[in-house]
Amino acid sequence: ETHDREKDNLQVEAEVALICDFVYENEKVIDIIPRYFSAFNDFSIRIQDGNKLSTKKNWGPNTKGISQEIIEIDNFTQKGVLSRYHIASFIKRNGIVHDYGTTSAVKSYSYFFEQLKDWMIEKLNTQEDCGPLEELTQFLKVAAKDAKGILIAAGATAYADFGKKNFVQKGDEIFVYVYDAHSHSFDDIFND
């Protein structure tokens, strides 16, 4: 849903959704346990107005998407199931399908697995209100009482040529895939 905001430069952000349990101690996160993953579209607005990052992410209802297929994570390491998965995104415009993001191996992200977990734990417990970032400990105080875990969107792909030059328009169809590259080829996904 574009909410008639096409002029604000809307872009698909193909990501992996990690559905995680949090372990808390004294209102701090001491561990994150990724349990499941899925394809996720963190559909974002690209207005560069100096506001908080959250205003570019949370700009309207029905602007995020998660696949109905949720896959269990056996272990969140290089040896786990996620290492086999790639992420791809496409836009169908006027009947033609275009690559939107570059197809990437999930394990190729600069921060993933243990390094990502450690970074997230540190940021969740210490991030202060600074520039485009918001203080996160205020949310943890509520989450520690009311939430077992959280969905974390990780690893947006780089944009393919079409994605770099074209923002989402009303009527576009968006496709985001997280697929097992040991079982499917890029062509399988593109032609799905």
Which stretches of residues belong to each language-model region?
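Short tryptophan-centered beta-strand motifs in secreted/extracellular beta-sheet-rich domains
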Residues: 16-20, 148-154, 170-178
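Conserved glycine-rich phosphate/nucleotide-binding loop
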Residues: 168-192
